[in-house]
From Swiss-Prot:
Predominant cellular place of this UniProt entry's protein: cytoplasm
Classification lineage: Eukaryota, Viridiplantae, Streptophyta, Embryophyta, Tracheophyta
SUPFAM superfamilies: Translational machinery components
An example Gene Ontology biological process: translation
InterPro entries registered for this protein in UniProt: Rbsml_uL18_euk, Ribosomal_uL18_C_euk
Protein name as annotated: Large ribosomal subunit protein uL18y
Gene name in the database record: RPL5B
Record carries keyword Ribonucleoprotein: yes
Compartments where found: Cytoplasm; Nucleus
Example of a GO cellular component annotation carried by this entry: nucleus
Amino acid sequence: MGGFVKTQKTHAYFKRFQVKFKRRRQGKTDYRARIRLTNQDKNKYNTPKYRFVVRFTNKDITAQIVYATIAGDIVMAAAYSHELPRYGLEVGLTNYAAAYCTGLLLARRVLTLRGLDQEYEGNVEATGEDYYVEPADERRPFRALLDVGLIRTTTGNRVFGALKGALDGGLDIPHSDKRFAGFKKDEKQLDSDIHRKYIYGGHVADYMRSMAEEEPEKFQAHFSEYLKKGIDADGMESLYKKVHAAIRADPTMAKSTKKEPATHKRYNLKKLTYEQRKASLVERLNALNSSAGADDDDEEEDDE
């Protein structure tokens, strides 16, 4: 009768034990997925597989084009949602629409870097429908593979918003439309109107309207930044259209202006020369002598 046999952790067990990779122990990297994203055919030389990497934090979205080398991963180009205020989007930097803008920005940036931006303009008007870039006569489109990391790939996840932005920007990324926002499982097809609504922030606009009617006080607090910037539900679509146009006009990364280093106060005493030390000693001696002479005069007056 077989059963569960507890591992005997003997001297031999510990001697032969091999630890897993550090990023596996930390739960940061799925190596089963990574090896398939990075391993290139052995008959191809100096032709890396490029990955379209998307990661989310609480306040930012990071999109990168990365390729692997023996020395480590090399980031060829990157775009962040905190760059979007430069293009006119100052609030809502982590939603589906912002993810689309970040993906679009990265696509236009990397194509500009490779000199393909004129040849592959992508889908200029976002309609919500699926889009595949058509190869041109001279140069093939820039191909990358979607790297989602440890994100759970549910339908409508923001990572697919970034993917859609990159596709409309002109990148060639193998994909299916099954995970875009608006895909209907029963009908097995994408509802492009719903997807377009998400791309232009329509879901946020609907939420703004419903909250303004039902809970006005909560609305004032929840959308305080939107209200400060003068953004309302009706102007949401026009705002995102302007952002998309601004990204296409200038996708290059802005150079950061470095401030001049501040002059720090010196707290350590500056080293004095021999003449300065001698003069200082003379001053101190004179001060002591004068104070001693003043004390003697006071004592004589008291005796009288």
